[in-house]
């Protein structure tokens, strides 16, 4: 058991917190990203630590960079709601969990890896996720994994199967409606099957049925075909009170483009939640 003295977790209460994954601002430093996220109206941020895509915290240098990230978040007035690592590499996740503990981040998000409809790959995925969730518990954080197009977990049935097999409090679901939509399901109806284990929501819109979610502008909440109001209603009705973080992927955006996506998405989500009495 690793004994780490961490900071108090930073979110709580009955209402959902809205955030943005800093990958949307991957062309800019973390200070600029946090300031833009706050200016767009959000409560907090998800820290992108995705190697090869966007590392606003370089995990190999987390001990020197984390205090700077913490100071930048405090200066901007944003809460650190979650961290995305994506990778299931054990050594990388050890660093992520240690950094999250220091920063007071309660949730670290990953993808499932593997291959859809391949039983051997699925079993490896389950074994790996279980092992990493046990490790997460040693650092006092929760590992959340989402269904991902093409991965071993790609739909509600495969998600349900995994959570039935990994009955650990340190393991949860990152429910991304765009991936469930691209699996041919209605996210607002699928949520009930996994809500009891949900710890995080990645959110974006999607035009068409995929496999890609579309260009960044088309991932703006309210611009696509997903019934996001219905999804928020299902979240609200369920009593979900975890983070909901906008995650927009694709080519690097200018600050104007990124701010437009963030601000428009916030306006849409905030209006939905106000209509539902959840903000």
Language model segments and positions:
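Histidine-acidic metal/acid-base catalytic patches
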Residues: 7-22, 26-44, 67, 74, ...
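Active-site-proximal beta-strand/loop segments in catalytic clefts of secreted hydrolases
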Residues: 23, 86, 111, 146-148, ...
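Short, well-ordered, mixed-charge alpha-helical segments that flank or form enzyme active sites
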Residues: 117-119, 151-154
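Conserved anion-binding
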Residues: 142-152
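Structural motif corresponding to the early beta-alpha repeats
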Residues: 42-43, 47-142, 179, 240, ...
């Amino acid at each position: 058991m690793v004994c780490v003295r961490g900071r108090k977790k930073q979110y709580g209460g009955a209402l959902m917190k809205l955030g943005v994954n800093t990958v949307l601002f991957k062309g800019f430093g973390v200070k600029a990203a946090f300031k833009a996220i706050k200016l767009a109206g959000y409560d907090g941020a998800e820290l992108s630590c995705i190697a090869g895509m966007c590392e606003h915290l370089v995990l190999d240098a987390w001990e020197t960079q984390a205090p700077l990230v913490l100071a930048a978040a405090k200066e901007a007035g944003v809460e650190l709601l979650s961290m995305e690592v994506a990778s299931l590499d054990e050594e990388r996740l050890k660093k992520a969990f240690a950094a999250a503990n220091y920063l007071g981040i309660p949730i670290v998000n990953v993808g499932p890896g593997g291959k859809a409809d391949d039983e051997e790959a699925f079993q490896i995925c389950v074994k790996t996720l279980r092992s990493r969730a046990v490790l997460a518990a040693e650092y006092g954080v929760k590992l959340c994994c989402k269904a991902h197009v093409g991965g071993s977990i790609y739909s509600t049935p495969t998600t349900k199967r995994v959570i039935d097999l990994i009955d650990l409090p340190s393991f949860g679901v990152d429910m991304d409606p765009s991936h469930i939509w691209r699996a041919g399901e209605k996210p607002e109806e699928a949520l009930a099957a996994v809500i009891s284990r949900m710890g995080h929501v990645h959110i974006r819109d999607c035009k068409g049925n995929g496999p890609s979610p579309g260009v960044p502008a088309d991932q703006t909440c309210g611009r696509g075909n997903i019934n996001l109001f219905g999804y928020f209603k299902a979240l609200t009705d369920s009593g979900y009170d975890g983070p909901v973080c906008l995650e927009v992927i694709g080519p690097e955006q200018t600050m104007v483009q990124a701010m437009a996506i963030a601000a428009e998405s916030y306006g849409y989500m905030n209006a939905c939640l106000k209509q539902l009495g959840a903000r």
